[in-house]
Amino acid sequence: MSKIADDQNFNDEEENFAKLFKKELEKEETLEKGTIKEGLVVSINENDGYAMVSVGGKTEGRLALNEITDEKGQLLYQKNDPIIVHVSEKGEHPSVSYKKAISQQKIQAKIEELGENYENAIIEGKIVGKNKGGYIVESQGVEYFLSRSHSSLKNDANHIGKRVKACIIRVDKENHSINISRKRFFEVNDKRQLEVSKELLEATEPVLGVVRQITPFGIFVEAKGIEGLVHYSEISHKGPVNPEKYYKEGDEVYVKAIAYDAEKRRLSLSIKATIEDPWEEIQDKLKPGYAIKVVVSNIEHYGVFVDIGNDIEGFLHVSEISWDKNVSHPNNYLSVGQEIDVKIIDIDPKNRRLRVSLKQLTNRPFDVFESKHQVGDVLEGKVATLTDFGAFLNLGGVDGLLHNHDAFWDKDKKCKDHYKIGDVIKVKILKINKKDKKISLSAKHLVTSPTEEFAQKHKTDSVIQGKVVSIKDFGVFINADGIDVLIKNEDLNPLKKDEIKIGQEITCVVVAIEKSNNKVRASVHRLERKKEKEELQAFNTSDDKMTLGDILKEKL
């Protein structure tokens, strides 16, 4: 081959190479920033968290793996899988994004859906991002741009996660963006809200709405495109209720408009206005004294609220739960959701109040006790309460009082010093007071009293000895055979009271034994008379030779 031919071939190859190179350059130049391309996953680097995606020719883009990873951490795409990506930068290794591609496709679909008549169309979404110019709002998977000047939001606050409503004001097909405005929404909505509110107020039939938000003071319901507040007192005929127990976001509910504040642009709605007033219905169906079945709906320390049905709630006061006076808390007897039978004790339709009783459907424990026991019966009771004056014993449904002076023969003893809560004591019924529903008990009457023991050893007019244990204004007490014996002031003669000392031994004669009152009285004065009487008797029966003078000499 000649040199000329070789040169020609070289020139042809160079020309062909140049053409091919130019075509490749043209291909790369068509890969503009912001383009959506169908690429191919060519490699996955899990350690560094990225995948390389071929987007045409020799160009490969870097894709973050977190964009194609599900909630469980599993990759949605594998090597050699086709994938749609958004090209964020030009060059040999541009940045690509799967999420942006999907988002841009959704935006484009929304733009086509809106058509030409998009202006002032209302969207509701959540703020998911923020940039220098404003906020990104997401609604049904589509991202919208809310500029700061159209946001009506405070610049110094964090609004991420906040739900907003806005009007569409601009659509950019080339840049795949939709601009929205809260400022425009308020302008459009205020006018529309006034018109629709008037329409709702004039409506005679309930309107179907959707629960949009639940708060402690009520629920916001959207009806005919505008929102109104159903105050918690307008939810049920029961009165104020907890909104969260009745509804959740997204629930459909019928409402009626009851007021509109034009100055504050607030629409008030009511749910209970759409329901027939049950209080009018029950006036002819329920009467005091009727027994009805109810369900416990709420428990407080002061009583229980019960659901009667038909949106009516009754109140069971804590004192009407049990005949037991020691009801510490209603939840010790009842639980929410429990079905019980109660007796109606009062109906007040005007004030929407209905009171019921649980205990009045059972026999009064006192009446049951009275039918089974009588005065004098001996039984056991458990100490329920201790006081300064005695102890209350539980006798099985009723309490009886064991007073200190009926518990011990020793008047200085007290129940609280000798018993504890839960002790079981054998007692005797002293009294059953039907009028006041009270029971008096005694423990001391089941044991022999000190006076009875004393009476077994001593009779009236017998002589006893004892030491002085106390001196009172009315007399002196001596202890004789384990019992305190009273010597009144008038019975001390010939002893002088002001000369008597504690511990002094006194001889006297028994003048009275009161077993029922556990009292013994004695007299020194009567002892002297007794001695004189005995001496006189001795004189009358003595030898005639003994004279009265002799007797007197002996005394002297």
Curated annotation (Swiss-Prot):
InterPro entries linked: NA-bd_OB-fold, Ribos_protein_bS1-like, Ribosomal_bS1, Ribosomal_protein_S1-like, S1_domain
S1 motif domain span: 35-105, 120-183, 204-272, 289-359, 377-444, 461-525
Gene3D superfamilies in the cross-refs: Nucleic acid-binding proteins
Family per record: Belongs to the bacterial ribosomal protein bS1 family.
Disulfide bonds listed in the record: none
CDD domains xref list: S1_like, S1_RPS1_repeat_ec2_hs2
Single GO biological process annotation from the record: translation
Function: Binds mRNA; thus facilitating recognition of the initiation point. It is needed to translate mRNA with a short Shine-Dalgarno (SD) purine-rich sequence.
Keyword tRNA-binding attached: no
Protein name: Small ribosomal subunit protein bS1
GO molecular function, one term: mRNA binding
High-level lineage: Bacteria, Pseudomonadati, Campylobacterota, Epsilonproteobacteria, Campylobacterales
GO CC annotation: cytosolic small ribosomal subunit
Native organism: Helicobacter pylori (strain ATCC 700392 / 26695)
